[in-house]
A protein has these predicted regions:
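Peri-catalytic and regulatory segments of divalent metal-dependent proteins
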Residues: 1-70, 122-123, 139-143, 147-149, ...
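Alpha-helical membrane and juxtamembrane elements of multi-pass inner-membrane transport
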Residues: 30, 44, 69-72, 90-94, ...
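Catalytic and substrate-binding regions of cell-wall glycan-acting enzymes that process beta-1,4-linked
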Residues: 143-165
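Generic alpha-helical structural context detector
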Residues: 48, 72-76, 80, 117, ...
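Post-HEXXH active-site segment of zinc metalloproteases
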Residues: 62-93, 131
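Short helix/loop segments within enzyme catalytic domains
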Residues: 1-7, 90, 94-151, 171, ...
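Residue-level signature of catalytic and energy-coupling elements of molecular machines
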Residues: 32, 112, 154
Length: 179
């Protein structure tokens, strides 16, 4: 996958946890839980998940998150001082900072989803893998209710976007239905 994405190979760590999850750390390594490995049923699904995480690394999301967090923190400190530095001002700044950070994170998740779909097409792989992987994880974890504080967009919105992106690239592709 790294050669398709034109990036360095990322070290892979397997963490023994039941909860299905995967993440990229410091933009330099990927961790996958055994719970995710047990949940996924097709090689294309693991390719999709790893492509999504590689997308975070390739697109520089770790650096962007750190930079954004620092900027939001500094702005928050300044605003808190402008509004008197009291507990209410601090609360308002914290809420605003959390909303801003979550919004940035949601955008990055969509970018990583798009990266995974596009990478599958580029590599001649089945682009439905990321779709069915997310669908399985969504069914396992339950429905994420829309909230400004969520770091990920609601799964149904992500799935619809992926479905549309796949069909734009190749209308003949049939999205598998999972049980």
């Amino acid at each position: 996958m790294a050669h398709i994405a034109e990036m360095e190979l990322l070290p892979l760590t397997i963490e023994h946890k039941d909860a299905p999850n995967a993440w990229v750390t410091n933009g330099k390594s990927v961790t996958v839980t055994t719970g995710l490995m047990n949940l996924l049923q097709r090689e294309e699904e693991m390719f999709g998940v790893l492509s999504h995480e590689a997308g975070h690394a390739k697109l520089g999301h770790y650096g962007s998150t750190v930079t954004s967090s620092i900027g939001i923190g500094v702005a928050g400190l300044l605003l808190n001082q402008v509004f008197g530095g009291g507990a209410l001002g601090e609360l308002a700044v914290n809420v605003g900072a959390n909303l801003a950070t979550a919004g940035i994170s949601r955008e990055m998740e969509v970018e990583a989803d798009d990266f995974a779909v596009d990478l599958a097409f580029k590599g001649g792989k089945d682009p439905t893998g990321i779709y069915t992987a997310l669908e399985r994880m969504s069914k396992y974890g339950g429905k994420l209710e829309p909230s400004g504080f969520n770091s990920h967009p609601p799964d149904d919105r992500r799935l619809q976007r992926m479905r549309n992106r796949i069909r734009e690239r190749d209308p003949s592709i049939v999205i598998p239905v999972i049980d």
